[in-house]
Curated annotation (Swiss-Prot):
Its cofactor is Mg(2+). It holds the Pfam family Ham1p_like. Keywords: Hydrolase, Magnesium, Metal-binding, Nucleotide metabolism, Nucleotide-binding. Homodimer. This is dITP/XTP pyrophosphatase. The keyword Nucleotide-binding applies. It comes from Malacoplasma penetrans (strain HF-2) (Mycoplasma penetrans). Pyrophosphatase that catalyzes the hydrolysis of nucleoside triphosphates to their monophosphate derivatives, with a high preference for the non-canonical purine nucleotides XTP (xanthosine triphosphate), dITP (deoxyinosine triphosphate) and ITP. Seems to function as a house-cleaning enzyme that removes non-canonical purine nucleotides from the nucleotide pool, thus preventing their incorporation into DNA/RNA and avoiding chromosomal lesions. It is an enzyme of class 3 (hydrolase). Belongs to the HAM1 NTPase family. Substrate binds at T7, Q8, N9, K10, R11, K12, S72, F156, G157, Y158, D159, K179, H184, R185. CDD domains: HAM1. It catalyses: XTP + H2O = XMP + diphosphate + H(+); dITP + H2O = dIMP + diphosphate + H(+); ITP + H2O = IMP + diphosphate + H(+).
């Protein structure tokens, strides 16, 4: 089964392929030249679901093929005014992951915080017929740590700062296979795969 992944991020494509490879339901995830074909998709929703739905609708309406989109972010319960659906552009619209991490480090330092509870959230939206959209949600609880000893120069998202619950290491220090068993995206993808399996 071919499903278009509503992203231009090759790293995200690789992650979805890895997450689904052990499924009994064979999926061929592909990415398309969205910017060239559709143009910039404005994610102006007020929730992860709304942003994922905007992307999924735009891609489905153009290609008329099954589409899976996701929107994800980091939430800090003690600092609800930051991050969330704006996590990927915390330091600016075109900010890099590295820039976002350093801005978060500086922000929390200014509040004299050494660690704070946190959770990653991922919402998937799947469209396979016109007007039919299903959503799947995964959450990953833990904490953000603040330290000058962190290596914030490399890594994905806020992984170099995020320590999952019941762990003593950051996500960046975990193996990819270990992360893919317990991450927020893994949980959402597993729900999606179970839906496909039950739908057969």
């Amino acid at each position: 089964m071919k499903i278009i992944l509503a992203t231009q991020n090759k790293r995200k494509l690789d992650e979805f392929i890895e997450l689904s490879k052990n499924s009994n339901y064979p999926i061929n995830f592909v990415i398309k030249p969205l910017k060239e074909d559709i143009g910039e998709i404005e994610e102006n929703g007020n929730s992860y679901f709304e942003n994922a739905l905007i992307k999924a609708n735009a891609v489905f309406n153009y290609y008329k093929e099954p589409v899976l989109s996701d929107d994800s972010g980091l939430e800090l319960p003690e600092f609800k005014e930051i991050l969330g659906i704006y996590s990927s552009r915390f330091a600016g619209i075109n900010a890099t992951d590295k820039e976002n991490r350093y801005k978060l480090l500086d922000y929390l330092k200014s509040k004299n915080i050494t660690e704070t509870s946190a959770k990653y959230v991922c919402v998937l939206v799947y469209i396979f017929n016109q007007g039919e959209a299903l959503s799947f949600k995964g959450e990953w609880e833990g904490k953000i740590i603040v330290s000058d000893n962190l290596n914030l120069d490399t890594g994905f998202g806020y992984d170099p700062m995020f320590v999952p619950k019941e762990y003593t290491i950051t996500v960046s220090e975990m193996s990819i296979s270990e992360k893919n068993l317990i991450s927020h995206r893994a949980k959402a993808v597993n729900q999606f795969l179970n839906f496909l399996k039950d739908k057969k």
